[in-house]
Amino acid sequence: DTTSHANVAEVEKFLGFHKVLEELFPLVHEKLEKTEIDGNLLFYWKGKSSEKPILLMSHQDVVPAEGEWIHAPFSGDIAEGKVWGRGASDTKCSVMAFFQAVEELLAEGFVPPTDVYLASSCTEEWGGDGAPKIVAELQRRGIELFLVCDEGGGIITEPIGGIHGNFAMVGVFEKGKADVKFTARSNGGHASTPVKGTP
């Protein structure tokens, strides 16, 4: 249970999750430099160059589990080809994905072309101070990141809020410019009263 609540950083809750990460990803913990900041994690993977370092980030905490659940909210059950539980989509899936990718690359002896940082806050769900503490640590080290990849996006295949079929969520935040081409086909209508099937 890694739920977080407004204005309360319950670091002890996350220590168990950190142990699971150590067991599942031994090479990450052996080969990368780990810094723990009040339950928040920062890993440093030395690359061939320190120019243009990148940061992969996501959060460990989840919102409280309320209501009825098909599977226990903290079970991580695998059923019907899916992982069920809090954090399966928001967003321990990202944490596990980047740890798994790095673990496999380390096993192959891969050295990234530039320095890579992995960061995971434990207070994101209530806008806490986890990410700012990680930023402060990076600033203390004099790190100027070239690219930050945070949670979000992806192709959603499950119905959400009455939307059926596959759809992609695109989120961009940068200084500069991004060109996105988007095509939707539908009968005309007005945004205030969209007809059924409007993309």
Residue ranges and their predicted role:
Residues 1-4, 184-188:
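Short, histidine-centered active-site or binding-site loop motifs used for metal coordination
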Residues 2-86, 107-112:
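Acidic/His- and Gly-rich active-site-bordering loop/insert found
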Residues 38, 51, 71, 113, ...:
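Short, solvent-exposed loop/turn segments at the edges of secondary structure
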Residues 42, 179-183:
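Beta-strand secondary-structure signal
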Residues 57-59, 120, 149-151, 183-185:
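Short beta-strand segments
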Residues 83, 89-169:
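Acidic/histidine-rich catalytic neighborhood of metal-dependent amide-processing enzymes
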Residues 132-137, 191-199:
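A short core secondary-structure module
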Residues 163-166, 185-192:
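Flexible glycine/proline-enriched surface loops and loop-helix/loop-strand junctions
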